[in-house]
Amino acid sequence: MSEVHEPGETFVVQPGTATSFWQPVPANGHIEVALDPSKVKMDNPLAFGTQTVPPGGYVREHSHDRHEEVIYFIKGKGRAVLDGKDVPAVLGTAIFVGKSRRHMFINDSTEDLHWVWLIVP
């Protein structure tokens, strides 16, 4: 016999309604958190949103000891530094960052650098 499962949640975030945070220098940009467990009940916790860094800004090197992260660049160009190695960050670049891996993002162009991110769990 097949197991019966209760339906999961549905939740919609319209443009301009995500939780938004200003990031001070050196990023000097903003991050939007569209989905996370504080907003909707999830069987498999995750967080999803966007980040924008203006020309000359960067996200400081950091790591997540309990989370994996996916980054997908949707506008602009810059660089990602993954465990000390530079990689181009341009439209369509997808990056997977495993737990405890150092990473940072640098906008060394003349336009905003914009990406979508997903963090699990």
Residue ranges of each PLM-predicted region?
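Short beta-strand His + acidic residue motifs that chelate non-heme Fe in jelly-roll/DSBH
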Residues: 60-62, 80-81, 97, 103-109
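A generic "binding-loop/recognition-motif" signal
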Residues: 55, 66, 85, 101-102, ...
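Short, conserved beta-strand element in jelly-roll/cupin
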Residues: 45, 50-54, 63-80
